[in-house]
Amino acid sequence: YKAGDADSSDDTRFGYTKENCWEAIRAALLFVENVERVPDMEDAEKKRLAAEAKVIVASRYFDLFRHFGGLPLIKETYDVQPSYELPRATVEETVNYMINLLDEAAATPQLPWDLGTDDTNWQGRFTKAAAMGLKCKILLFAASPLFNDNVPYCTEPPQDAVTNHQVWYGAYKPELWDQCLQACVDFFTELQSRGYYELTQATEATAKGYRDAYNKAYFTRENNKELLISTHISRFGKFNSWDEWQYIFVNSGNGTVITGGLTPTLEFMEMFPMSNGEPFQLNTATDLFYTDNDYNKPIRDPRLYETMLVNGTQFGDHAAELWIGGRDNINDTEKETGKYATGFGCYKFYKEGVNSLKDKYLQWPYLRLAEMYLIYAEALLKSKNDLPGAIEQVNKVRARVGLGDLAVCNPGKNLTTDADALLEEILRERACELGLEDVRLFDMTRYKREDLFRKQLHGLKIYRNDGGGNTPWSGSTGNSSIYPKPTKFTHEAFPLVNPSRAWWSNFSPKWYLSAFPPSE
């Protein structure tokens, strides 16, 4: 929302008619309606492709649903005609439509559980596992307080959508959590029987091994058995020989990363625990990221280094210098501008920029097995109040990167008895594991976390503590000939104000969802 409001000339964060959702839905429905007419295709292939098309419809409906709530339910294609209108369905009707499509797809014998080795060149196609997993993800969102509560998410006028149950169920329904849990049980029962999918594990129990495993889990397309659904950038033409990669996002002078659009905050950095799984404490930490600023001695959760660029990380031919005046951060943080405005940089999916991504086939995970374990954990907690069971599922995700037992690492939080505290840890774990994978914003909206939306965010100013001043150490302008490599730093948290977010001082719960265009 621009300047705290939205009007008919503005685009919301997800355009109702501008994200190719309806085009994809129509194309998929058109395929389902006509595939049987294809004369030279085997019947098994027809049924498989029709099932995949149904998953496409459900996935695109879900993309809209988590932004708008109840939607018009299109179940057939329309010919060109002067006008046609469909009413907006309730939240319950919209969820049921998506789930029925996924159930129909999963029940199709010709839809394979996995792509296997024979179909690895078809990465991105939907499978039975994808259909069952997406069902869990949809039910998790539907069961959450945004739609499933005794009070509507917004009480500001007009209230037509509230009265018509188009933005909530009308009351709290605990059975929705039961449905989510059952969907998870069904998925993992099938996984135990069918196999194939697994968390990408480290080949060696070292910091590098754990980081490499996480990198492969979210970043690698080929031979990735953790991916249930992957998506790719849709862009016409090529830039710099990048196949299906959005050049403007990465490298242009006004690109998103270059101008600081994805710059991590101090609050996000603090979510990542120490390398043993214990919470990170900024106020008592001597070193924040590496022992003595040596990138061969990391001390934090390996996922941190794959998610954000931090001071001291190996960065091309040198250790990243993100202190004020450093080689990589001459004045970004001081002026709160550019890709290091907060004292950190975006690393996940961006890596080291244009040269590191050149000629890569890149994908964003839409659903990974790691997320399935975290969905299962949340469903166990909310449906059965099974705290030990929930912790067990979270630990499977943490163990992949070498972190210890969640409850043992947080003895003061009483995670085996305090359900609210455990939920906070599950949401934090989701933020760390699934950062930049289109999850955190929706975790905040589905739990109606006005406190987090209003929370002032911070950056971190870093200063050399060796007498070398606000200057680079390495590179042509560095003073490495005079000073040894800096090992200690002074840190100063500062509020982010360039610009300040409108909702910090003027939040409205209506912003949990996006606005429909006035023409609709």
Language-model-detected regions and their locations in the chain:
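Conserved, well-structured interaction surfaces
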Residues: 1-68, 82-123, 293, 298, ...
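Long, intrinsically disordered, low-complexity segments
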Residues: 21, 97-99, 122, 152-153, ...
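Amphipathic alpha-helical repeat scaffolds of TPR domains
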Residues: 53, 58-60, 130-145
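Carboxylate/His-rich catalytic cores and anion/metal-binding grooves
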Residues: 57-61, 306-307, 311-335
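Short coil/turn linking the two alpha-helices of tandem helical-hairpin repeats
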Residues: 65-66, 72, 138-150, 382-385
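Short coil/linker segments at helix-helix boundaries
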Residues: 70-88, 146-179
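Short edge-strand/loop segments of extracellular domains
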Residues: 77-81, 392-403
